[in-house]
Amino acid sequence: GRGMKMKMEKEEKMTTADPKATKETVELWNYLHAVAGKQIITGQHTQTIPCEEIAYIRQTTGKEPKLRGFELLGYSPNINYADASPECLTEIEENKGTAEMALQWAIEQRKNGNGGILTFTFHWFSPLGGRDKSFYTEHTDFDAREVLKEGTPERAAFYHDMDVIAEILRRFQEERIPILWRPFHESYGTWFWWGAQGPEVARNLYHLMFDYYTCLLYTSPSPRD
């Protein structure tokens, strides 16, 4: 009927939110859109650098997941090592170098024509510090609502950390490797600082990051330029 036709036309017009998305990003988006509701993409998050989960799957099935996930928590600029539990320190240590490993894996997948898909999760330690695993609400006094206000320490710290992570992600952009970027995960709950103040605040944090990461910023070395 007419309603189904309109729905199909709407689906056909779906595209990336960033009109300047790279060719590789658009190709990944089109692939995900094409398999949606028809196929299942198997994936596995890697908990540590050795990627023992992948080795187990390979040994058991003779195959590897098409999608592989990595964690960026070790790149948080404000980890309080002096007040971190042994568990926290172990988790940080086990995730050091994940970006480099992910980049190497993605390049190899492209070289071999395997079409691997890369996704990143970021357990973001509080931009203003805290105790132990300060991405947990109970371990930080960081108020995400303050990020949405101009001129606050929270906002400055938020943007500082985004700059740090942007430099990591830039390596993948230079290699033209798209990423399924997963910041502010589980924001429907209150256990992480980015979700502690409710879904609207979490949504606005995402919008800030999206705008900041997709807008082209130009700086000149000379006032005359």
Where do the language-model regions lie?
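Catalytic domains of carbohydrate-active enzymes, especially glycoside hydrolases
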Residues: E53-P77, G113-I117
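Alpha-helical scaffolding within the catalytic cores
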Residues: P50-I57, E100, V164-I168, R224
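Sec-exported extracytoplasmic/periplasmic mature domains
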Residues: L73, E174, T214-C215
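Conserved small/polar residues in nucleotide/adenosyl-binding loops
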Residues: Y218-D225
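N-terminal module-boundary/linker segments of secreted carbohydrate-active enzymes
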Residues: K7-K66
